[in-house]
């Protein structure tokens, strides 16, 4: 949404897919916790242009960062000027994306363990591997043999892929 005044910010109006994110209140609570934590870290470091580096959601009159119109959930955030998207990624952009993701993870390393699970088992690799193995066994589309090499590679790495879940169960890794 583009504002009329030249010096006023523009906005992004986004419909939240509540078929996927069924607990919209928890989703937004998580986003508020993450963006608030990152904003505080950047401000403490004296970072310039924090508004370009952290999403800012516009609250409703009731103070919520989403609106339900009776059918759909919506949220509005300020548009980040000069932001870009790329259809094709080259190694240089991949490097920058990896660096940004690493910085994001580092800033969240000490976030309190209060985030809710908005999609159950989404990051549970043991669960995802079981889903994959069930799909391979069913071979509903008849294409398993075409991708056997990739499936074998996944199986070779399965134990390592499940390490985080094991460490969490053993109390050696916080759930984040």
Question: Each predicted region: which residue ranges?
Answer:
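Conserved ATP phosphate-binding architecture of protein kinases
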Residues: 1-5
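ATP-binding pocket architecture of kinase catalytic cores
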Residues: 7-29, 39-115
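ATP-dependent phospho-/nucleotidyl transfer catalytic cores
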Residues: 14-25, 80-95, 110-176
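Donor-binding/catalytic cores of nucleotide-activated saccharide
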Residues: 34-43, 168
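Generic, well-ordered alpha-helical scaffold segments in large soluble proteins
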Residues: 34-37, 107, 157
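Charge-rich, low-complexity amphipathic helices
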Residues: 35, 98-99, 126-127
């Amino acid at each position: 949404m583009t504002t009329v005044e030249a010096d006023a910010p523009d906005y992004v109006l986004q419909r939240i897919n509540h078929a996927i994110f069924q607990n919209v209140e928890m989703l937004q609570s998580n986003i508020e916790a993450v963006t608030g934590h990152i904003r505080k870290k950047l401000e403490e470091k004296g970072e310039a242009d924090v508004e370009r580096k952290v999403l800012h959601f516009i609250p409703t009159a009731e103070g919520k960062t989403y609106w339900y119109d009776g059918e759909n959930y919506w949220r509005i955030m300020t548009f980040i000027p000069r932001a870009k998207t790329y259809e094709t990624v080259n190694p240089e952009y991949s490097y920058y994306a990896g660096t940004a993701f690493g910085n994001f993870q580092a800033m969240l390393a000490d976030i309190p363990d209060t985030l809710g699970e908005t999609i159950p088992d989404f990051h549970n690799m043991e669960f995802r591997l079981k889903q994959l193995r069930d799909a391979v066994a069913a071979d509903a589309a008849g294409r398993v043999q075409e991708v056997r090499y990739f499936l074998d590679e996944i199986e070779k790495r399965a134990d390592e892929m499940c390490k985080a879940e094991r460490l969490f169960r053993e109390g050696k890794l916080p759930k984040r």
